[in-house]
């Protein structure tokens, strides 16, 4: 797939605005689906996301990065916390967060007892000392996946 042409196509179809810079694959990205660089306007994308989740999810990530891109060049709020960003992202149907591609093998599986959020860690944590970051509930070790 020609990434640059695909990003230009998504920009025209979903935003009706032209993408005038370059888009690149970046194999070093681990936890993020893509990045926007305001200094020179280029976009980086994680090829592992495309391979793991397919074109539909990848298109939503492209939309997310294009929201940053277009809002920046319109002089509007382009950061995640800005209202303009949240509204345009919702309007075009982009992903707010990248789905996780890390495998839980060889990790400890913790779960919050209140909100049932799952956490995977390589190192064991002291359950008396740490709480859930989302709701402050107590954590419990479900199983060691080693």
UniProtKB/Swiss-Prot annotation:
Residues 4-142 form the SprT-like domain. Keywords: Cytoplasm, Metal-binding, Zinc. Signal peptide: none annotated. One of its GO terms (biological process) is response to stress. It is found in: Cytoplasm. Pfam families: SprT-like. GO terms for molecular function: zinc ion binding. Its cofactor is Zn(2+). The active site is at residue 65. One of its GO terms (cellular component) is cytoplasm. It comes from the Bacteria. Binds 1 zinc ion. Zn(2+) binds at residues 64, 68. NCBIfam families: PRK04351.1. Belongs to the SprT family. This is Protein SprT-like. The lineage of its organism: Bacteria, Bacillati, Bacillota, Bacilli, Lactobacillales.
């Amino acid at each position: 797939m020609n990434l640059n042409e695909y990003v230009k196509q998504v920009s025209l179809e979903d935003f009706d605005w032209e993408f005038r810079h370059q888009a690149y694959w970046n194999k070093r990205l681990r936890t993020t689906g893509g990045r926007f660089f305001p200094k020179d306007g280029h976009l980086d994308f994680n090829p592992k996301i495309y391979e793991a989740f397919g074109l539909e999810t990848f298109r939503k990530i492209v939309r997310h990065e294009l929201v940053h891109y277009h809002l920046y060049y319109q002089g509007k709020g382009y950061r995640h916390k800005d209202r303009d960003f949240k509204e345009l992202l919702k309007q075009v149907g982009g992903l707010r967060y990248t789905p996780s591609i890390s495998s839980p093998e060889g990790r400890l599986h913790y779960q919050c007892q209140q909100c049932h959020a799952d956490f995977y860690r390589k190192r064991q944590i002291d359950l008396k000392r740490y709480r859930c970051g989302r709701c402050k509930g107590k954590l419990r070790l479900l199983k060691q996946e080693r």
